[in-house]
Amino acid sequence: MIQMQSTLEVACNSGARRVQCIKVLGGSHRRYAGIGDVIKVSVKEAIPRGKAKKGDVYNAVVVRTKKGVRRPDGSVIRFDRNAAVLLNANLAPIGTRIFGPVTRELRTERFMKIVSLAPEVL
């Protein structure tokens, strides 16, 4: 469950390390974002010589949350930290590698690239 001001770690090699959610996209009064939702983020911490610089604003898709995601069979998949993958204007990932597991809920037409790059799909 990600809301405005939430900090997330970045699960790709775009150069950003930590980002802060500045807007949940998809409705004028939408408060929370879950796994698979697109948010607007600001880069708070970045590595030198990376594509993303501190202060840059990007779209990002949430790939892991502490709140987790509930499956139709009743099981819940939770993670230790909140994480996102930075996206460009066309909603394609900026980085060329994805770190850590992602969930099957990302297997939509929009995010198949992220699922194919991920080392593990839960």
From Swiss-Prot:
Gene Ontology, cellular component aspect: cytosolic large ribosomal subunit
Gene Ontology BP annotations: translation
Pfam families (alphabetical): Ribosomal_L14
Keywords of this entry: Ribonucleoprotein, Ribosomal protein, RNA-binding, rRNA-binding
Subunit and interaction comment: Part of the 50S ribosomal subunit. Forms a cluster with proteins L3 and L19. In the 70S ribosome, L14 and L19 interact and together make contacts with the 16S rRNA in bridges B5 and B8.
Role, per record: Binds to 23S rRNA. Forms part of two intersubunit bridges in the 70S ribosome.
The protein's name: Large ribosomal subunit protein uL14
Lineage: Bacteria, Pseudomonadati, Pseudomonadota, Gammaproteobacteria, Alteromonadales
Gene: rplN
